[in-house]
Regions:
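Gram-positive cell-envelope targeting signals
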Residues: 1-30, 117
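Generic recognition of cysteine residues
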Residues: 19-23, 47, 134
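N-terminal export/targeting and maturation segments
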Residues: 25-66, 78
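Short, well-ordered, aromatic-rich surface patches in folded extracellular/luminal domains
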Residues: 28-46, 90, 97-166
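Short amphipathic beta-strand/extended segments with alternating polar/hydrophobic composition
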Residues: 51-57, 75-79, 124-135
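A short-motif feature that recognizes glycine-rich, charge-decorated loops
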Residues: 64-99
Length: 166
C-alpha cells in the first residue's frame, strides 16, 4: 500500500513539473522564439477615439515604434534591442500566431469597429489577421496588452499620457 502512494505521488509530481516548466514540456526555450521584425496593428470605429495605429518599422538606422492615436497625433520612438526582445516575448506570450488567417466580417452590422494585424518575424514567419465587427478569441485582453506596451514606451520617452487625448 505504501508503494502505491509513492507511485501516485511521483506521478503527480511529474505531471505538475510538466505543467509548470515549459522546457520540460517540450516548448522552445525563450531565446529560441522567433523575434518580431515588423509589426502593425490598427483599429477603426464609429468615433475618432477608435482610430489608432501601432507599428514597428525597420529602417537602415534601426527599428522605430510609429504610433498614431485618434487619426491625428503621431509619435516616432526609437526601439532598443531590449524593447524588441520584450515585444517579441509579449507577442509569443499572447499567442498571436493563433490569429493568423483570421479574416471575418459581420455584414449585418452597418457601422462598428474593425482591426487589422500584420506581424513579420525574423525567421520568415508571419501573422495576418483582420476583422470587421468580428474579433478572435481573447481579442480585448490581448490588444490591451499591446496598447500597454506602446503606452509604457511612450511614458519612458517622457510623454505624459494624461496630457494626451486618450
Amino acid at each position: 500500500m505504501k508503494r502505491r502512494w509513492k507511485r501516485i505521488f511521483a506521478g503527480l509530481l511529474a505531471a505538475l513539473t510538466l505543467c509548470l516548466c515549459p522546457c520540460f514540456a517540450g516548448a522552445a526555450p525563450y531565446e529560441d522564439l522567433p523575434a518580431v521584425k515588423t509589426f502593425q496593428y490598427a483599429t477603426s470605429g464609429m468615433c475618432i477615439e477608435e482610430f489608432n495605429r501601432y507599428q514597428i518599422k525597420e529602417t537602415t538606422r534601426g527599428r522605430f515604434a510609429w504610433i498614431e492615436l485618434h487619426n491625428d497625433d503621431h509619435y516616432v520612438l526609437p526601439l532598443t534591442e531590449e524593447d524588441m526582445a520584450a515585444f517579441s516575448a509579449l507577442v509569443q506570450e499572447l499567442g498571436l500566431t493563433e490569429w493568423n488567417g483570421y479574416h471575418e466580417v459581420d455584414r449585418d452590422v452597418l457601422d462598428g469597429a474593425s482591426f487589422s494585424l500584420s506581424v513579420e518575424f525574423e525567421d520568415g514567419g508571419a501573422i495576418d489577421a483582420s476583422g470587421s465587427n468580428c474579433f478572435p478569441r481573447g481579442y480585448s485582453e490581448k490588444v490591451s496588452a499591446i496598447r500597454d506596451f506602446f503606452e509604457k514606451l511612450m511614458g519612458e520617452y517622457g510623454f505624459d499620457l494624461n496630457d494626451l487625448w486618450l
